[in-house]
Amino acid sequence: MDIDALKASHMRHWNRFHQLAHSRRLTGPEIDELSVLYRQVTADLAKVRSQNPDQDVISYLSGELLHARARLTGTSGASLWAISRWFRHDLPAALYRIRYVTIAIMLIFIAMTALQTWWILRDPAALSMLGSPEQLKNYATTEFSSYYSQDTNASFMSYVWTNNAFIALRVVAGGITGFYPIMALWGNAQNLGISAAVVIHYAGPAHFFSFILPHGIPELTAIWISTAAGLRLFWAWLVPGRKTRGQALGEAGRSMITVGLGMVILLFLCGAIEGFVTPSDLPLWLKITCGVNLTAGVWIYTFVAGGRAYRAGVSGDLDEDAGYATPVI
């Protein structure tokens, strides 16, 4: 690599980077621009170090990066900016990276659940293995619906949120094993299929879907996304590409932590629906609309905001300059 040619082709954005890093005040768009340039200059520094370690250029870029990093973290309102950037760029980009895996998992889950439900409904022997007719009827007509009103709305919401958030984070973290997310997905599909078969057989499909759909659609979406995130972690370990296994796993891990935190937020909203909307006297269409709108919002957020952020070079990494790419003099 010709270092002079590199300097000539990159000097324009290096100068802009210097100008922003040394500005006394930065607007919101300028902070975003500085953040983007920070990643570009970090990549430039890595290229120089690996292909033509010119000490003058390395010292210059390292100094500029250190100054910019201090500028970003020391900017008034930087915490609010970081939170805003996380919602506008990091989280949607991380979701966008696993969008197709999430869709595939969704289809597999629906197929497994439908198959389990169909098999139990068509086979009286399979249904009888789940309990006596009296027990199953009591579950379908009483226990299934009373579950959603067993406590105060706020307490029940808190319970389901913390329980589901823990499951989602465990699925993401357990992704490194490769099999844990699949086992969790299979278990959820089987349990939902059994519940669906029993309730549909004894109380009818309307009774089942009226209690499941309002919160179930976005809640299951969170589980599917968490499963995809966990499997992405396993894939990074299995197939690191041109990076070392540690680098690939570290980057994927930080990105998937972003997804995990996003799912905690989504499941909080699901918990609010399950705790306050599902057991309420609202019209069924309005209950289902709440869940559908939340789910649609997640997918729009993923494809629109996520696609935009991903094309801008954002990966969802919690600290894209961390570890081996940290600029030091």
Please identify what each model-predicted range represents:
Residues A93-A111:
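Alpha-helical transmembrane segments and their helix-start/interface "positive-inside/aromatic belt" motifs
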Residues Y139-Y159, F209-P218:
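Short aromatic-rich membrane-water interface segments that cap or initiate transmembrane helices
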Residues G174-I329:
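Generic detector of multi-pass transmembrane helix bundles and their immediately adjacent loops
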Residues L107-R122, P218:
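Hydrophobic alpha-helical membrane-insertion segments
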Residues T152-Y180, I194:
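Individual transmembrane alpha-helix segments
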Residues T117-T142:
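Interfacial/capping segments of alpha-helical transmembrane domains
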Residues M1-S84:
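Soluble N-terminal domains of membrane-associated systems
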Residues A82-I98, Y147, S155, G246-Q247:
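Cytosolic juxtamembrane amphipathic/interface segments immediately preceding
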